[in-house]
A protein has these predicted regions:
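Conserved AMP-binding/adenylate-forming core of the ANL superfamily
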Residues: 41-46, 106-160, 177-182, 242-249
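Conserved S/T- and glycine-rich ATP-binding loop of Class I adenylate-forming
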Residues: 145, 162, 269, 275-278
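Structural core segment of the AMP-binding/adenylate-forming
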Residues: 164-247
């Protein structure tokens, strides 16, 4: 069967190509005397035949915060066992929060249409406060922290604060229900649990407090459960018991300070993600 070559529906303008990050990267490679690439195909070909040079150059060009180490790649016949930057040290949150401007970092619209905007400064300050709170709760590098959370600015703050310490983040949606959440959360033995006070579905606000209380009581490793606001009615967290605390109260004892980032090995875990669980327990 013969298929005629078709023209693309859209092509970027010359000006847009000039401003593209990939164009800037190619110019950087040329100045660094690593190659002169006329088009994307040439860059791609070089990237897969000169893997170490490509990723080392990308680290430098991207101004990655951390230490690259002296080895870019430890190859292996089985790709899953190959290691990039085996001696490197890095912190995910440090690189996310490395913005030099105070423009919007997060623009969030809930299901009802309410709009929330957080600047980079507001995001940094919130992560600073939460990091201090988590350290006070004993969270350390390598610990697991879980969330039963929807997409929201508070979820992003929690993720960044956890990763800033070098701890590992895992989450699932609150509409999973108790059984599905328990199947996942119980496996990783989190020290701290984050839960939204509720979530929105089909125009309705649904409370998340019962599932937070049930998980807190059923997972022995959980020492603290932090409830952040999403629904528009202040939540009663008394069912959670003494381990439960509102986000605002959890952060209240601390003042904003410079964040200390715990750099971890480049190949250390950042997230724990689960399979669907359709063929047994989630893995």
């Amino acid at each position: 069967m013969c298929i005629d070559k078709q023209e693309p529906i859209w092509r970027p303008s010359t000006q847009r190509v000039k401003k593209a990050n990939v164009t800037s990267f190619c110019e950087y490679l040329q100045k660094s005397e690593l190659g002169n690439f006329e088009d994307y195909d040439a860059l791609w070909d070089w990237s897969v035949t000169n893997i170490e040079n490509f990723w080392s150059a990308f680290w430098d060009y991207g101004n990655i915060q951390g230490s690259k180490g002296d080895v870019v790649l430890t190859p292996c016949k089985e790709i899953i066992n190959a290691k990039f930057f085996p001696n490197g040290k890095i912190n995910y949150a440090e690189n996310v929060l490395n913005a030099s401007n105070n423009g919007p970092a997060i623009i969030f619209h809930d299901e009802g249409g309410a709009r929330t905007e957080w600047s980079w400064k507001e995001l940094y300050n919130s992560v600073s406060l939460l990091q201090q709170s988590l350290r006070e709760s004993g969270v350390q590098k390598g610990d697991r922290v879980a969330g039963i959370v929807p997409n929201s600015p508070y979820t992003i703050v929690a993720l960044l604060a956890v990763s800033s310490i070098g701890a590992v983040w895992s989450s699932c949606s609150p509409d999973f229900g108790l059984s599905a959440a328990l199947d996942r959360i119980s496996q990783i033995e989190p020290k701290v649990l984050f839960c939204a006070d509720g979530y929105q579905y089909n125009g309705k606000e649904i409370s998340n407090i019962k599932i937070a209380a049930d998980l807190t009581s059923r997972v022995p490793s959980i020492q603290k459960t932090i409830i952040f606001p999403l629904n528009h009615v202040e939540a009663d967290i008394s069912p959670i018991g003494e381990k439960g605390i509102l986000w605002s109260d959890y952060l209240a004892p601390f003042a904003v300070q410079k964040i200390h980032y715990e750099r971890v090995n480049f190949n250390d875990p950042l997230f724990i993600m689960f399979s669907s669980g359709t063929t047994g327990l989630p893995k």
